[in-house]
C-alpha cells in the first residue's frame, strides 16, 4: 500500500473538509451518547453505529492520505453504504427522545449521514466524471498518485496493441502495381500454377517496378494524410509522462486542454496546443 502523507489531506480541500466534518460529527455523537447512556436508557444498537463509523472514518482518512481512492473506491463505497444504514437507524431511535443528549447524538448521526452520502457520490464515480475531475482539480498533490507513481492508471488497460500507430499507411495505385497481377485466379501465381508452361515467362511480367515505386512515393497524391479534425476537447485531470519506448504517446500536464479526434477507445488520438499529436490514455482526461 502507498505511504500515508498528511499533505494529501491538507492539500485537498475536499478531503480536509469532509474528514474534519465527519470527525466532528462522530465526536458529537459519541460524547452525547455517553451522556445519554448515563441519564436514560440508551439503545444498545446505536453503540454499534458509533463503533462502525469510527472504523469507516479512519479508513476513509487513510485512503485520502495515501491517495488510493482509485484502488479502494469500490470497497469504500460498500462499507459506507452499510454505515449509512446504521446511522439512519440510529437517528430514528434517538431523534424523538425527550433528553437533549439523545437529540444531540441524533444530530451527530445526521451530520455523519450527510458526509457519507457525499463520499459515496465521490468514490462511486469514475475518474472521468465531470464532478470528480472538478473536485480533484483543487487538490495540490492529486496528480502524483501514491498508488501508481507518476502514471497512476496506465497499467489498468494493459498493453496497447501496435495497430494503433498514428502514421499513415502506405498506399499504392494500380500504376505502381503494374506487372504484379496474377493471371491465374486459381493458383495465385503469375503465368499459372507451378509447373505451368507460362511459368518461365513470369519474370517478364514484373518488369522493373522500382522506378515506378520511387516516382509513386514522391507524389503527394498517393499519400493519405493523418487525421486533421479534432472535434472534442478534453481536460487533463492528471499529469502523464509518455512511455519513452513508444513514440506514439504524448506527455501532458494536469489541467492542460487537449483536442481529441476519437473518444471511442481507451487510448484517444489527441493534439496539444503546440501542435504535437499522439495518443493519450482516456482515464487521464475528461471531456469538456
From Swiss-Prot:
Protein's membrane topology: Multi-pass membrane protein
SH3 domain ranges (all copies): 229-288
GO BP terms, alphabetized: regulation of actin filament polymerization
A Pfam family it matches: SH3_1
Cytoplasmic domain ranges by topology: 1-14, 66-70, 125-288
Polar residues composition-biased segments: 197-221
Transmembrane segments: 15-35, 45-65, 71-91, 104-124
Cited InterPro entries: SH3-like_dom_sf, SH3_domain, Sho1_SH3
Membrane topology, Extracellular segments: 36-44, 92-103
Gene3D superfamilies, per database record: SH3 Domains
Residues annotated as glycosylated: 44
Similarity annotation: Belongs to the SHO1 family.
Biological role: Plasma membrane osmosensor that activates the high osmolarity glycerol (HOG) MAPK signaling pathway in response to high osmolarity. Regulates radial hyphal growth and germination. Involved in virulence and mediates resistance to oxidative stress.
Name recorded for this polypeptide: High osmolarity signaling protein sho1
Annotated organism of origin: Aspergillus fumigatus (strain ATCC MYA-4609 / CBS 101355 / FGSC A1100 / Af293) (Neosartorya fumigata)
Gene: sho1
